Amino acid sequence: MDIESVRSFCLSLPHADEKVQWGNDLLFRIGEKMFAVCALEPGHGVLLSFKCTPEKFAELVEQDGIIPAPYMARHHWVGLERFDALPERELKPLLKNAYQMVLDKLPKKVRMQLV
C-alpha cells in the first residue's frame, strides 16, 4: 500500500475523517480520536503508525520494518518504517481493528451521534 491507498481505505470506514496536524502528519480519526497517522513527508522514520492490541503490538514489533511508534508505543501503537513492511491483506484488517478499538472507547454519547 502507499499513502493514497491507506488514505482511501481509512476514509472508507464509517464516519472516519482526516486532519493535518503537527506540521506534516495526516491523522485519521473517528469521533475526533485518532486511530492512524501517516507522515506526509518521507524521511521521518515512520511512514504510518496505528493503534493495536497489546498482543498484536508485541507480535508486530518483532517484524523487520515495524517499530514501536514514537511517543505512542505505551498506548500500543506500532510504526511502519516503510509501506511494504506489511502486505495489504494484513495491513487493512489492522487499520480496521485500530478504527474499531478507538470507536469502542468513545463515550456512548459520541458513538450515538455517529449513527
Predicted regions and their residues:
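Charge-dense, helix-prone N-terminal extensions
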Residues: 1-115
